[in-house]
């Protein structure tokens, strides 16, 4: 299944829905470009909903780690949520569950950001 994503933007948060298989940098180019564009526009809080992500390999994980590093270097945060069981097992095996901020749901991810920023991140 080909990788794709959609994004919903609020004033202070970019909410990404990832779908398909994230296996190579080429398929993630649009994601990286979109992310960097948001970051350059001053958006520093991101939620990546992985609910529809079918598969990710080490290259795909590397893409996510690169995005996480960029946002943290900018003083922000990237939270992943709705992680499928197989992908969660991969995060546990690689110990990336200690690197990424992982939430059970999109609402939980937004609440984490609200606590960090003391702001009114929209639930829409």
Language-model segments: residues:
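A charged, well-structured terminal subsegment
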Residues: 102-124
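General small-molecule cofactor/ligand-binding pocket signal
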Residues: 6, 81, 103
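Amphipathic alpha-helical interaction surfaces in cytosolic regulatory modules
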Residues: 22-100
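STAS-typified acidic loop motif
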Residues: 3-33
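Long, contiguous secondary-structure blocks with strong helical propensity
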Residues: 12-13, 77-78, 114-118
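Residues that form or immediately flank small-molecule/cofactor binding pockets and catalytic motifs
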Residues: 12, 85, 107
């Amino acid at each position: 299944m080909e990788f794709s994503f959609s994004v919903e933007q609020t004033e202070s948060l970019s909410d990404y829905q990832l779908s398909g298989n994230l296996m190579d940098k080429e398929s993630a180019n649009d994601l990286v470009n979109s992310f960097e564009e948001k970051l350059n526009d001053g958006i520093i809080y991101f939620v990546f909903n992985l609910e529809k992500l079918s598969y990710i390999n080490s290259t795909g994980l590397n893409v996510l780690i690169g995005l996480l590093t960029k946002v943290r270097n900018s003083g922000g945060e990237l939270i992943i949520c709705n992680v499928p069981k197989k992908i969660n097992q991969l995060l546990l095996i690689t110990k990336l569950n200690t690197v990424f901020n992982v939430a059970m749901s999109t609402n939980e991810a937004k609440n984490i950001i609200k606590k960090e920023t003391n702001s009114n991140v929209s639930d829409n």
